[in-house]
């Protein structure tokens, strides 16, 4: 079913963002391609298709699909798992607040459009990270419910890592918006959990079989 397919990929986008936040917070680095994909997903305001948001290929969400699968099957129940769920829950709270603020949504769309135009002129990923991080601080953080990130103090105090983490939280919230647009909701994670697990396994199987 196409709806379950898109819901599964949206959830993978959420999980990928949250997982990369954890990587940065504890090691100071994360998968560069996955980060770039998450970053550029924020720029896609009017995508031609769902997968266009994530670089036109499901393989760009492979990390998120693996994290989604391990989360729904409880295969790696640990402090890291609890932390991941907490980040996702907090992003969902912020998405609800954002949805209620037409002013914030309007401002975000306009400013993202400008940032996107600038990025596609010079493809400067560092500049894009800085500008999206600043936009997160300016608009999303001002909504309240700031997300407290756990990790190694030296990494958390690094300005560039802070910017990257803000961008990943931003992309996670973007993925939550997509998830809801395709009919996703929290009860679904309980009642349709089996179907989402099955779909995630199927997508991963085809992706790995193709490589």
Swiss-Prot record:
Belongs to the HflD family. It comes from the Bacteria. PANTHER family: HIGH FREQUENCY LYSOGENIZATION PROTEIN HFLD (PTHR38100:SF1). It is a peripheral membrane protein. This is High frequency lysogenization protein HflD homolog. One of its GO terms (cellular component) is cytoplasm. Disulfide bonds: none annotated. It is found in: Cytoplasm; Cell membrane. The keyword Cell membrane applies. Keywords: Cell membrane, Cytoplasm, Membrane. InterPro entries: HflD, HflD-like_sf. Pfam families: DUF489. It comes from Buchnera aphidicola subsp. Acyrthosiphon pisum (strain APS) (Acyrthosiphon pisum symbiotic bacterium).
């Amino acid at each position: 079913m196409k709806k379950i397919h898109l819901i599964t990929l949206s959830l993978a986008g959420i999980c990928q963002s949250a997982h990369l936040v954890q990587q940065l917070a504890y090691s100071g680095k994360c998968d560069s391609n996955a980060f770039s994909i998450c970053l550029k997903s924020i720029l896609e305001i009017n995508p031609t298709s769902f997968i266009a948001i994530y670089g036109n290929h499901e393989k760009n969400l492979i990390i998120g699909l693996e994290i989604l699968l391990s989360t729904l099957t409880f295969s790696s129940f640990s402090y890291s798992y609890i932390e991941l769920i907490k980040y996702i829950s907090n992003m969902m709270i912020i998405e609800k607040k954002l949805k209620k603020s037409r002013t914030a949504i309007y401002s975000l769309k306009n400013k993202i459009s400008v940032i996107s135009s600038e990025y596609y002129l010079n493809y400067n990923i560092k500049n894009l990270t800085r500008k999206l991080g600043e936009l997160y601080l300016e608009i999303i953080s001002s909504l309240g419910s700031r997300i407290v990130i756990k990790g190694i103090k030296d990494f958390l105090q690094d300005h560039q890592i802070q910017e990257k983490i803000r961008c990943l939280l931003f992309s996670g919230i973007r993925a939550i918006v997509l998830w809801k647009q395709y009919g996703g909701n929290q009860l679904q994670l309980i009642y349709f959990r089996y179907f989402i697990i099955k779909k995630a396994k199927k997508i991963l199987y085809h992706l790995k079989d193709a490589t």
